Amino acid sequence: MPSVSIWGWLEQELTVDTSWWTQHSGGTVDEWDLCAHLESQYGPVLERRYAAWITPADVDTLATADVNTLRIPTTCAAWVDVPGSQLYHGNEVSFLSSIASYAINKYDMHVIVDIHSFPGGANGFPFGEARGHYGWFNNQTALEYSLKAVDAAISFIQSSDFIQSFTLEPINQPVDVEVSRSSEHLIVSQTGGASYSSNQSLGKWKPSMQKSRLCSS
């Protein structure tokens, strides 16, 4: 299954397009601080990015290389506006819909929608919300907003004309690996997440997901 992950489009990482990052970031290392640095301009800057970084012509190019699966990372903020978050909540879903519809209708591609970050931070990496953010674990409020994001992504897929052409990746690399604790033993939950803590959030994830519309027909 030839596939491509479309980094740096609906979620930003400093290593993907270094020229763009250098132009806009002010020396920051993650999207959270990028948005804070841009202040009132972060919306227009990111909207221009969404419109230009990936276009139907790029999908055409991928199709000529026999790519048949697109994995598209998004931030949690693409799906739900989280109070206190620096991440931008704008027209990400509209851009996702446009490219996904084109890829599916013209080339019968499969699209994996990836929710790449969660409120509070699920792994401490720059792409996990922000560098050093581990606050998702054992945080009921963060979990509730995460489930709202998952529910919104499911609604997006269910409202499409090609539900069978999508897969949802509801969480990316959840692990609270702080450098100061790197010599300790990890606890691995039944969902595959790893944690030094009690895994309460990870343990709740599976039954909570079962209550969501993932299980509806």
Would you name each region that the model predicts?
Residues V4-W9, P73-C76, D114-F118, E169-P174:
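Active-site-proximal beta-strand/loop segments in catalytic clefts of secreted hydrolases
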